[in-house]
Amino acid sequence: MKSAFEIPFAGLKVGTHEYEFDVNDSFFSSLPYSLVEKGIVKVWLDLEKKETMMIAHFECFGHMEQICSRCNEIVLVEVDAELDVIYKFGSLEEETNDDNLIMVSYDTCELDVSHQLYEMISLATPARPLHEEGECNEEMVELIAKYQVKETNKKDDDVDPRWSALKGLN
């Protein structure tokens, strides 16, 4: 079955071509081990085809549902990102150290950009999503404060005697 994120580039003329993709819940659920479950993201792709390579410029904007790290409730996180990828025609055995350079074999006629879309969207989300100050579930915030372990004010003078002997070595 052909994916909505596959681009048949074999018949494309040399030049720039524009594409639009709608990334939604079904996209995220179709990917194994996806960290994102729900979201709506609009993606624009400018694909410049040349004789020996294709240069892709992705832009995305939208929002995703994630779990707030403070109160464990759902928070809407905005996604706004760009990604540039170079698809170079050549042997797949060629090694590259550049994450934005992808080798494409000469006999390939379609380009599946779903991995690049997921990577761009995932990297645009915060590692620790939080509600704005004052928007968290108050009941949960109170419970966290109630059970939070208080830090003891341990002075530097309370050093283990074995370690204090090392201070005299200077």
Kindly give the residue locations of the regions a language model identified.
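Charge-rich, low-complexity linker and terminal segments
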Residues: 1-10, 14, 40, 89-170
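A positional/architectural concept
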Residues: 1-67
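Aromatic-residue hotspot detector
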Residues: 28, 87-89
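Cys/His-rich Zn2+-binding cysteine-cluster or related metal-binding knuckle/ribbon modules and their
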Residues: 64-65, 85, 128
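Short, cysteine/histidine-rich loop/knuckle motifs that typically chelate Zn2+
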Residues: 70
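Cys/His-rich microdomains that often coordinate metals
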Residues: 75
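Short Cys/His-rich "knuckle" micro-motifs
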Residues: 78-81
